[in-house]
């Protein structure tokens, strides 16, 4: 056999064995069933439903492709994650699903460059979690007569957690009483959360500066796989 022919056959066999170079995996948001229709997305992902830690990443849609703008270690509910449509209030679980972001808030002044609506937390600021109140799952300032303080969050009392935050639109537009209230993306406390998603303070400030209301940012919360996988939402 001619040397040149032998080399060609060997080369061809290598190509057949190895195959073509694998295509790069699509960015995570591109693998989601829905991203909310905007061009900014926050992805909060835990390994499993029983996990209390994971990652948060935030993404921009640029020229038809999702590009990661940042990422941070994240914490979830002390009892893990649960499908948002079946969650029950007071269970210390983080609701999975795709949600809008109604507004930002904080005990501290907004980071320079913040463009989302940002409500300052005052001594009179509360989040009503009383299922009997007309203000259920709403920011109230001051606390209305029909909302019991013992069933609600006095926002200024939660430092450093509420130094900076974004409201997650879970159970927000048409609240189902008893499903849950006051689910936020906020600054880390000492450990796992009561159902919110938390990140380090510097990263929370970065997210606030990054989010642009004109680009309709959303947040998706879920697991790496299974029935609560972020790619299902």
Task: Kindly give the residue locations of the regions a language model identified.
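Secretory targeting and sorting signals
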Residues: 1-23
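Cell wall/extracellular polymer interaction/catalysis modules
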Residues: 23-193, 204-233
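Short cysteine clusters
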Residues: 196
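Conserved "landmark" site that anchors the functional core of diverse proteins
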Residues: 200
């Amino acid at each position: 056999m001619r040397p040149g022919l032998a080399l060609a056959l060997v080369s061809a066999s290598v190509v057949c064995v190895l195959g073509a170079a694998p295509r790069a995996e699509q960015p995570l948001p591109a693998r989601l069933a829905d991203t909310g229709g905007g061009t900014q997305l926050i992805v909060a992902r835990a390994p499993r439903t029983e996990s209390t830690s994971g990652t948060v990443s935030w993404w921009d849609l640029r020229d038809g492709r999702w590009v990661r703008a940042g990422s941070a270690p994240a914490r979830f509910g002390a009892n893990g994650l649960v499908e948002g449509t079946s969650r029950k209030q007071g269970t210390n679980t983080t609701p999975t699903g795709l949600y809008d972001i109604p507004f930002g808030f904080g005990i501290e002044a907004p980071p320079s460059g913040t463009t989302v609506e940002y409500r300052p937390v005052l001594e009179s600021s509360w989040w009503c979690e009383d299922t009997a109140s007309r203000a259920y799952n709403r920011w109230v300032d001051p606390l209305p007569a029909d909302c019991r303080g013992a069933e609600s969050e006095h926002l200024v009392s939660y430092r450093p957690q509420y130094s900076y935050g974004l409201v997650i639109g879970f159970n927000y537009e048409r609240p189902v009483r008893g499903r849950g209230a006051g689910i936020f993306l906020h600054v880390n406390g000492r450990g796992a959360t009561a159902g919110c998603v938390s990140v380090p303070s510097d990263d929370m400030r970065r997210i606030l500066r990054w989010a642009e209301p004109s680009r309709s940012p959303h947040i998706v919360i879920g697991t790496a796989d299974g029935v609560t996988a972020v790619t299902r939402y």
